Amino acid sequence: MTLKRGIMLIGFLGACTMLVSAFAGELEISGTPGSPSATTTIDGKQLPPPPDDHFGGKIERSVLDSTPYWPPGVVPPKGAPNVLLIMTDDAGYGVSSTFGGVIPTPNMDRIADTGLRYTHFHSTAVCSPTRAALITGRNHHRVGSGIIPELSNGYPGYNSLMTKDNATIARILKENGYVTSWFGKNHNTPDHTISRIGPFDQWPTGLGFEYFYGFMGGDTSQWQPGNLYRDTTQIHPYDDDPDFNLITAMADEAIDYMHNIDALNPDQPFFIYYAPGATHAPHHPTPEWIEKISEMHLFDEGWHKLRETIFSNQKKLGVI
């Protein structure tokens, strides 16, 4: 599979500017105007864009004298990049080798070496506020996420409600013609809305993400995730698979999603928010990873020596 325009966001702000600025320009219609095949881009001056309820056809007394009309579908501008936004859980600034840690993350290193390392993103001590800020570009209090949903209350900034006037990245990109999805942890939906009957407006599918495969809440078992959902339907794939592992299944789901896009429309840009939760308790690494990390002897010299090593690495990288 060839995925064109590939881009990974280690930080979001710079890429957001690039995407939004790319949408500026005159509106042009491709395909036959008024037909279902007609497409256009939007200029990005107003996000989200105003609804287009203009009817460009003609209605007369007979069908023969009338002209049907479909409004043009919105597509991203030519060359719009794919966007993969990855957020790890409970992994500190000095964990990955990309930021001076001793845990080898060679693919992230490669991307960072040819791109940018963002070093000034504000991260809170609990994850929900940071997640809300990341997917909206706003201070977490502005999107009701001053605390985790389990401790939310009825006061402004702390009710865990993202209102319609605070659009997520996914909603903005979807309305610019992207396909959007969320894989992994969702710790931004209020507890009282997590049920089989919703309401679902605060779930990923109600926040601009067209597809969701992941778990609701702060943590889950990697072997038997009882809070696993596909869109808004609870699923139990581990019932028929004793070897089921969520972090592996999640990666497979995301890869299948990209394969499907490429098979149906290779020119269709996508936005994927990928939020694994395996580094959050409960810690359930697979035997293969336990063996792999153990053989590296990364922590044999103890905490103080490890701290000195990470500090030295980060000074060399210039990230502190």
Q: Where on the chain are the PLM-derived regions?
A:
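Boundary at the C-terminal end of the N-terminal hydrophobic targeting segment
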Residues: A22-E26
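N-terminal module-boundary/linker segments of secreted carbohydrate-active enzymes
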Residues: S30-P36, F55-G56
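Formylglycine-dependent sulfatase
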Residues: T40-I320
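Bacterial N-terminal signal peptides
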Residues: I10-M18
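Compositionally biased non-globular segments, especially hydrophobic aliphatic-rich helices
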Residues: R5, M18-V20
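Bacterial N-terminal signal peptides that target proteins for export
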Residues: M1-I10
